[in-house]
Each structure stands twice: as C-alpha cells, then as structure tokens.
A protein has these predicted regions:
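A sequence-level detector for low-complexity, Ser/Thr- and acidic-rich stretches
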Residues: 51-57
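Structured beta-strand segments within beta-sheet-rich domains
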Residues: 63-96
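Surface-exposed loop/edge segments in extracytoplasmic proteins
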Residues: 15, 59-65
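Extended extracellular/luminal ectodomain segments enriched in beta-structured repeat modules
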Residues: 43-47
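Hydrophobic beta-strand residues in large extracellular and virion-surface proteins
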Residues: 37, 48-50, 67, 75-77, ...
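Extracellular receptor-binding modules and their adjoining Ser/Thr/Gly/Asp/Asn-rich linkers
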Residues: 1-42, 80, 90-107
Length: 107
C-alpha cells in the first residue's frame, strides 16, 4: 500500500490514495450524500477527509468529503455539495486520484 506518513507530533496525518475508479455519482444540491466505499485503505477508528475533483470550473478545484471507519477497509464517506446545483464529480483516475487525509491520534 502506497502512503505518505507525516507526523506533526500527535495526531499524525496520513495520506493514502482512494482505491478504485468509482466516484460518488451525483450529489444533490446543498446536501451530503453518505456512501459506504469498500476495499479502501482505512482502518477501524480512522477518520478525516477525502479530497476529490468535482469536475466543474475550475477543473482542478479540489473539494473535501468527510469519512469515518467502523469496519476495516470500509470508508463511510459523506460527500458534500454546498452549491445550488447537483454535482457529479469526476471519477478518480491515476492523474486525478481521490486522496484520503487520515487523522490518527495517539501515534
């Protein structure tokens, strides 16, 4: 598993790539859409953000969704869309990966 571990004392910040090439699909306007993403590089009690590319102008704008993990390998992701219209993010690819920013305490 590829990862970058950067410790700033406690807690530690760990960045890992999202596994797979399926995005959240359409996110309704002014809402959070919660999904269970399986086969992800997360452990029980992990929490933090998922950075994703919304695929709107500007194309490289990155937005965060939050996640938590209660079962190893499954990220419960809340994809956030604060805009007035529905949002269909660009699916993750090798050049535009989604990234987990995991906050670990007690390391």
């Amino acid at each position: 598993m590829s990862q970058i571990d950067q410790s700033f004392g406690t807690p530690a910040i760990i960045i890992r790539p999202y596994s797979g090439t399926t995005g959240p699909g359409s996110i309704a306007a002014n809402s959070n859409t919660e999904v269970n993403a399986t086969s992800q590089p997360v452990d029980v009690n992990d929490q933090g953000w998922v950075m994703f590319y919304p695929g709107v102008t500007p194309a490289n704008n990155v937005r965060p969704g939050t996640f938590r993990c209660t079962t190893a390998g499954t990220a419960i992701i809340s994809w956030n869309n604060p805009t007035a219209g529905a949002l269909t993010p660009t699916a993750p690819t090798a050049t535009t990966p989604y990234l987990f920013v995991i906050v670990k305490s007690g390391l």
